[in-house]
Regions:
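Active-site beta->alpha loop and helix N-cap motifs at the rims of alpha/beta catalytic domains
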Residues: 3-5, 9-13, 19-22, 27-104, ...
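Conserved anion-binding
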Residues: 56-58, 97, 104-105, 109-141
Length: 141
């Protein structure tokens, strides 16, 4: 089992990377905006994260697109940032279709917002390399 750091904060990523135990990073535009980032700079920020963690550490960057074609287009752009970028896609019907398309192109996908075992199975069947399970989130509200 591997655990990934879920943040957009470069200082947190640098600190975790210095421990030598960082398995990966996941982030999204919402986390980036919480540290003062602007959506227009998100791709550049992903590049900075990739530079910090190095090429052997996967960095999951989330697409905010909502349709299959938009997610695929955004996913291709994200994947072009660095070889260790994993496209993070919400577990929804359009996301499953986009995951299959990207996986068929050899682009790694992390399906997020995965709440149930059946969703995880669907994600795997669609070609996702990773899932980001949300456990206990409803209890936190």
């Amino acid at each position: 089992m591997k655990f990934f750091l879920d943040t957009a904060d470069l200082a947190e990523i640098e600190e975790a990377a210095s421990w030598g135990a960082l398995a990966g990073v996941t982030t999204n535009p919402t986390l980036y905006s919480r540290i003062g980032g602007k959506l227009d700079d998100f791709h550049a920020h992903i590049k900075r994260i990739c530079d910090i963690v190095g090429p052997d550490c996967p960095v999951s960057a989330e697409s905010v697109a909502m349709t299959r074609d938009e997610i695929v287009r955004d996913g291709r752009e994200l994947a072009a940032i660095a070889p260790n970028v994993v496209v993070k896609i919400p577990t929804m019907v359009e996301g499953l279709a986009a995951t299959r398309a990207l996986a068929d192109e050899g682009i790694p996908v992390n399906m997020t917002l995965c709440f149930t075992v059946p969703q995880a199975i669907l994600a795997a069947r669609a070609g996702a390399r990773y899932i980001s399970p949300f456990v206990g989130r409803f209890d936190d509200i």
